[in-house]
Amino acid sequence: MAPPRFDCKALYEKLDQQRLAQGLSWQDVARATGVSAATLTRTRQGGRLEVDGMLAMVAWLGLPVEHFVRRSPRS
């Protein structure tokens, strides 16, 4: 079995849904989560995230981290 991975794109999609539902800009999301705009961009691009930033964004969404962890069998 392949090691689990964090699904950054799924996190970004949830952030965007929450942002739109609350009528917020991405700058508002950055302020609310305490992460930089660059971190939000990396999330959108599926890049690597620092654990603190990732946890801050997940906490803002009110979801468990496990919601974004993907486990898949090795090919």
Model-derived features with residue positions:
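A short, Lys/Arg-rich alpha-helix, primarily the initiator
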Residues: 1-24, 28
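Generic leucine side-chain signal with a strong bias for well-ordered alpha-helical environments
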Residues: 15, 24, 40, 61-63
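Short alpha-helical DNA-recognition segment
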Residues: 22-42
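Residues that mark the N-terminal boundary/hinge immediately upstream of a DNA-recognition element
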Residues: 25, 50-53, 64
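Short amphipathic alpha-helical surface patches that mediate protein-protein
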Residues: 34, 45, 73-74
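Short, basic-rich loop-to-helix N-cap that marks the start of a DNA-contacting helix
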Residues: 42, 46-59
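Short C-terminal boundary/hinge segments that cap the last helix of small helical domains
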Residues: 62-75
